[in-house]
Amino acid sequence: MNRKMKITENKEKLYIDELVDKLYCVEVSGKASEKCRTYEKAIQLLLNVFLRHKERESQLFFLGNGGSCAIASHMTADFMKNGGMNTYSLYDNAVTTCMGNDYGYEYIFSRPMEFLVKEGDLVVAISSSGNSRNIINGIATAGKKNAEIITFTGFSPDNKARQMGDVNLYVPCGKYGIVESIHNLILQQIVDMIMEKDGVKF
């Protein structure tokens, strides 16, 4: 019993160690191929983008499937309630099923975005693989609307979404749990930093 418990504890420790290690290996780059060399600079770059759009009162949209959808929905709430930003959900059941039924699942984001996204808005696309067709279509629509795009991806370094954003955050790991946890953690850190700038005391 004690031996099994010890093995479990070691595995948990190793998993946490891997998560922290990958967190500090996160790569943030822009279209001009410039890269942030430290975690702190990467976070500051992302924070500056969100703060700029908050000041402009831009609309903010999050895209994601599965676990990334859960993160997107969570951040839609947090960036509005705690960050004071104009977030809009793309996850209304009636709209999602309508778009999926009438146009196909690959268009569940891009079709409503054609009506909702305006020039100068901010779109955050979250995808562990960076290759989900509906996410790629959503990013493409955001680009046509001249919205600013941030991508959060993982797995392969040459995934499609990573090539399409104005700012691209990449987690060099093939595990869904690690990639999704880091995406969520970084976005939550951005919310907390916005709150601190607004004078909120923790």
Identify the role of each PLM range:
Residues 1-202:
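Conserved N-terminal alpha-helical segment that immediately precedes and caps sugar-phosphate-binding
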